[in-house]
A protein has these predicted regions:
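N-terminal interaction/assembly modules
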Residues: 1-187
Length: 187
């Protein structure tokens, strides 16, 4: 029970760090509603993953408590009535069904001497969700995925440069190489 309470308290702190996700950092202007709804879904899927990691539950076991306690807070903080539920369930079910494969891709992207066990839980769950989107949701531009998960890493006080570098490297080398090398893409 203490693990669940600790996880829920940590999630409340994270929800308070969301200002960079719902608006443009440079202008302060709110992003479009559809973008914020999808951002809320991404954030919720990462928070659920973190909760499951901390409590030792599966994603599906942790989901009811998480949905009852945090989805409304996330939506309110991102100034949306509700998150993009379809995207949330697609990410959660994808990570749940492909966890071993996603972890293998993360391990392949790590520097020599690094293992999954050495990663912070927050970085691990962010990477799983980001890689899932890069690999399985090709209708979403790779740059958007990279930007969103970098913002989520920042909200979680995770190593943003590490998360971005690993996702970018996998996108360029394996998952979205054609898109990432297309004219107009920054190198």
């Amino acid at each position: 029970m203490q693990k669940i309470e600790k996880s829920l308290m940590t999630q409340k702190t994270i929800v308070e760090n969301l200002s960079q996700i719902d608006s443009n950092e440079k202008t302060g202007v709110l992003r479009p509603m559809a973008v914020r709804r999808r951002a809320a879904a991404r954030l919720a899927s990462v928070q659920l993953g973190y909760s499951a990691e901390v409590t030792g539950q599966s994603l599906l076991e942790a989901m009811p408590t998480f949905l009852d306690n945090y989805v409304d807070d996330i939506a309110r903080q991102l100034r949306v009535k509700k998150m993009d539920s379809e995207h949330f369930y697609a990410v959660v079910s994808g990570v749940n069904n492909r966890r071993v494969e996603l972890d293998k891709m993360i391990a392949e992207g790590l520097s020599e001497g690094w293992t999954l066990m050495r990663l912070a839980r927050t970085e691990l769950v962010i990477l799983r969700a980001g890689i899932l989107e890069l690999d399985g949701m090709t209708h979403i531009p790779a740059r958007a995925v990279l930007s969103e998960y970098a913002s989520i890493a920042d909200a979680f006080n995770a190593d943003v440069r590490f998360v971005n570098a690993l996702l970018d490297g996998l996108a360029r080398r394996k998952l979205r190489s054609a898109e990432m090398s297309a004219p107009g893409q920054a190198n």
